[in-house]
Amino acid sequence: DPEERPDELGDLDNQLADQHICNFSVFQSLLDHWALGQLFPIVPIHRLNEEPTLETTLVDITCDSDGKVSKFIDLSDTRDTLRLHEVTNSPYYLGIFLTGAYQDIMGDLHNLFGRVNEVHVFLDEDDERGYYIEETLPGNTVAEVLAMTQYFPNNLAQKMKSQIDQAIKADRLRPQEGMRLLADYERGLKEQTYLSFKTTNGK
C-alpha cells in the first residue's frame, strides 16, 4: 500500500517506471515541454483494444539526459508516468497532440536531427473518410543536415573514397569490400536522420 510506505520510498513507483525509447527529439519536436514544462496530450494510436499495463516515461534518441518526457496530463491533474502497452518486436505508435508548427520552428536543428516527416491532413465532410491528405513532406536527410553545417556530402564521399583507395592499396581492405563500404556510406547520406525500420515485407 503506497500510504504505508516510509517517506524515503514514497517515490518508488516513479523510480521503477519503465522507459519507452521514442524515435524523436524532445528538443526538436517538444521544445516547450523541456523549456517551459508545457504538457501535451500523449496517447497510443493503435492497440486500442488492449489494456496498457506498463507505467512508463518517454526518452528520445538524442543521448541527452534532458531528452525525456516525465510529466503527463491526467484526468484532473498531472502524473509522472504514462500507462502504455508492453513493446513487442513490432513498431509501437504514440500520438503527441496540439504541438503545432511552432515546436519545429523553435527546435530548428537541435541535436542535428532536423525536420520530421510531415503530413497535411484536412477535415472534409464530403469525403467518405471525413478527411483528406493534401500532401506529405519528407523529413531531412543526413546529407541535408550536414550541408547546413558546412559539411557537404560530395566532399565527404570523396574523402571517404580516398581513404578506401589508400586502404585497398595497402592491402588492408579488399576492393570488393571497399566498394561495398563506399556504397553503404553514400546510401547512409541519403537516408533520413531519424531511425528507420523495415516493415515485415522488407520495404
For each of these PLM feature ranges, what is it?
Residues D1-K203:
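Charged (often Lys/Glu-rich) extended helix/loop segments that serve as interaction or gating elements
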